[in-house]
Amino acid sequence: MNERGQGEQRVWEGGKGAPLLYLHGFEQHPGGAGFLRLLAENHAVRAPEFPGYGESGGFERLRDVTDVVLTYRRLIEDWGVGPVDLIGHCLGGMFAAEIAALCPHLVRRLVLVNAYGLWLDAHPMPDPFVMTPDALAKAKFHDPGWAAREPNVFAGSPADAAIVRTGNLAIATKFMWPVADRGLARRLPFIHAPTLVLHGVSDGLVPLPHAAAFARLIPDARVQTIAGAGHLPMVETEEKFVSAVERFLTPG
């Protein structure tokens, strides 16, 4: 397992098997987090860092969501493995859904994890960019005690985690501010791939009804909730998360 450059975009990769692409959330790349290593036991996993995040360049070329989709389309096509299984978390979930809608030939199965991308008047999302660290931890985690361990999971250098995160958030505002709604709801019906909508029950950033809204708009989708988890079920409930993903990707 290693990290390697993909042009200007850093990519974590590991494992062998069916190709699996993982798109991370708005705060930071997960590095070699435990859930990625577990997925790499049965899949050839690639987890690119979003352009402009951490050590990856290329953000200046992204004018809108369409440019993001084209960036990932190029990465998948350069991989040369045919359609991939695609997992997107948080903001990465929004981008994964866009890819599946606009490039359906590239996606075999789709997993959306606590995904952004919709706006529900009855269930508004808080603005994570103005929340205090304590408020953000309470919103993100079922057990806020996980917040103290998060940099060790998500950042290669915990001492630099706050600086890296600040820069990442500045980039995320392009797609999430004032709200993370760029018209995705109109495109979700064009997704052909079987879709699993995974959602941590205690998520205080993306309320649980958003999961049902995704499933209503995607033709072949179902919802699975994960108790004891908030916005990061792959961290708080790693084994439950990986088990749910594996059952969906390899049914039978």
Spans of features found by a protein language model:
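Catalytic active-site module of serine/aspartate enzymes centered on a nucleophile-bearing elbow/loop
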Residues: 221-252
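Short beta-strand/loop motif that positions the catalytic acidic residue
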Residues: 191, 197-199
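Flexible "cap/lid" loop of the alpha/beta hydrolase fold
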Residues: 97-102, 108-139
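Acidic catalytic loop of the alpha/beta-hydrolase fold
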Residues: 202-206
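Active-site loop/oxyanion-hole signature of alpha/beta-hydrolase fold enzymes
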Residues: 46-87, 243
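Conserved alpha/beta-hydrolase catalytic His-Asp/Glu region
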Residues: 121-127, 134-192
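Gly/Ala-rich beta-loop-alpha elbow adjacent to hydrolase catalytic centers
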Residues: 88, 92, 96
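Conserved HGGG/HGGXW glycine-rich cap/lid loop of the alpha/beta-hydrolase fold
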Residues: 7-55
